[in-house]
């Protein structure tokens, strides 16, 4: 599918006011413009910023060439409780503020007239986070288009290294419609390997790459996988590397790697929660220069730009799902939505991460004292098994503080629904 940035032409205002809309360019952190006061309900966790609710609108007249296209609008991150409306009709929602999600505009767009896209983001429900969250549409928005009858499915290309001697990769392609799929592995502009076959919906092609340059933390060599199907084309950057784990720890290309990592949150300092590719790359570069070879996305799925930077610079990534499950850590956090949404959230996280060689590990949660309870132990199994069903090429862990669990087991838990209300 073809991607077009949709970051300009937006208007913004507070949801609970009749103030005039002002133009903004995405990514946009609405919370940074709020007053800072000692009376802020978020307190030190929010940087003393007050919380409000917001609305964004974008008016557009679609090009006539889009009539025969599938139209999918991707929001990489909206904090939080996002609702998306097209011409007054709700077309998407996502409570979690850190996972990318899609609004299907196909057959809903009105041609030859102006359309209005409206996005609501809420952040007045303070406190809802244990760190500075930012607010609004703080990550990029992309419009994905393709022929309705025949195209590569969204997130429909998955690349897996089978072996490194010889260097062999499997490319699985999901399509809408039947036809011939061709796959090329490119080293720069040069074709390194190719294969083709007919498909009726899903096919896996195996390619051997001669004289392959492997990906690791010291030599982050990257290739491009070009998939063609009908008039559609998909380009995926990937690295050839194997990953295994066991008694010897993490093995990358059969060699043990000592993981020297740091936890990083999603904000970019004085830029707030806005996600800029240059800012993400700067963070990774500084960490590499200071001896780190791994980062943990604390405590939520990271941006696509951060993954790209880690791929290019040779930084390992542990992508983490969430800070809590069913026990509140703040009064208005994600707990009420977790049970309904965790599977979709995780599926979107894996779709985002799968082709990135930097991702070596998933985490289902951070300091989850639920694991001290029978219910929580069962949930741990469900989360882990579900992630393995989505991606069996990477291990799954969970941030567990044994001392916190001990305190919880004797009735003195650090986290509890009651404490979250104080």
Specify the residue positions occupied by each region the protein language model found:
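Accessory beta-strand-rich segments of carbohydrate-active enzymes
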Residues: 3-16, 30, 46, 51-152, ...
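Conserved, mostly hydrophobic/aromatic
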Residues: 88, 141, 223, 254, ...
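Extended acidic/polar, glycine-enriched regions
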Residues: 110-112, 174-246
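Substrate-binding/catalytic cleft of secreted carbohydrate-active enzymes
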Residues: 294-422
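Short strand-turn-strand beta-turns centered on an Asx-Gly dipeptide
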Residues: 85-91, 186-188, 230-231, 253
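N-terminal carbohydrate-binding accessory modules
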Residues: 1, 154-161, 214, 226-287, ...
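Short hydrophobic beta-strand segments in globular cytosolic domains
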Residues: 91-92, 192, 257
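Surface beta-strand/loop "capping" patches
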Residues: 148-177
């Amino acid at each position: 599918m073809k991607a077009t940035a949709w970051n300009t032409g937006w208007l913004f205002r507070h949801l609970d006011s009749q103030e005039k809309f002002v133009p903004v360019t995405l990514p946009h952190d609405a919370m940074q413009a709020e007053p800072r006061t000692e009376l802020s309900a978020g307190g030190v966790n929010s940087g003393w910023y007050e919380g409000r609710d917001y609305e964004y609108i974008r008016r557009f007249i679609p090009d006539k060439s889009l009539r025969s296209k599938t139209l999918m609008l991707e929001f990489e991150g909206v904090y939080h409780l996002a609702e998306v409306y097209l011409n007054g009709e709700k077309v998407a929602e996502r409570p979690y503020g850190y996972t990318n999600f899609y609004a299907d505009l196909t057959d809903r767009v009105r041609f030859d007239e102006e359309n209005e896209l409206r996005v609501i983001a809420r952040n007045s429900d303070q406190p809802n986070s244990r760190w500075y969250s930012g607010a609004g549409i703080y990550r990029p928005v992309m419009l994905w288009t393709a022929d309705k009858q025949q195209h590569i499915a969204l997130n429909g290309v998955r690349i897996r290294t089978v072996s490194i001697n010889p260097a062999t990769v499997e490319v699985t392609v999901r399509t809408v419609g039947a036809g011939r799929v061709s796959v090329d592995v490119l080293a720069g502009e040069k074709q390194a390997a190719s294969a083709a076959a007919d498909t009726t919906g899903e096919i896996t092609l195996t390619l051997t790459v001669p004289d392959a340059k492997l990906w690791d933390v010291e030599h982050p060599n990257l290739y491009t996988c070009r998939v063609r199907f009908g008039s559609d084309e998909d380009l995926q950057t990937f690295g050839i590397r194997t990953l295994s784990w066991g008694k010897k720890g993490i093995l990358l290309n059969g060699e043990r790697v000592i993981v020297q990592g740091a936890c990083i949150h999603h904000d970019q300092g004085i830029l707030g929660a806005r996600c800029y590719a240059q800012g993400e790359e700067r963070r990774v570069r500084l960490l590499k220069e200071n001896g780190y070879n791994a980062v943990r996305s604390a405590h939520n799925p990271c941006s696509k730009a951060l993954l790209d930077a880690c791929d290019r610079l040779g930084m390992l990534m542990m992508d983490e799902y969430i800070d809590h499950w069913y026990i509140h850590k703040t009064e208005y956090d994600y707990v009420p939505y977790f049970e309904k949404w965790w599977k979709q959230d995780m599926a979107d996280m894996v779709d985002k991460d799968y082709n990135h060689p930097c991702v070596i590990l998933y985490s289902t949660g951070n300091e989850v004292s639920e694991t001290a309870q029978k219910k929580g132990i069962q949930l741990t199994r469900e989360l882990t098994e579900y992630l393995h069903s989505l991606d069996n090429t990477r291990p799954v862990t969970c941030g567990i503080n044994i001392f916190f669990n001990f305190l919880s087991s004797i009735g003195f838990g650090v986290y509890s629904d009651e404490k979250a209300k104080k």
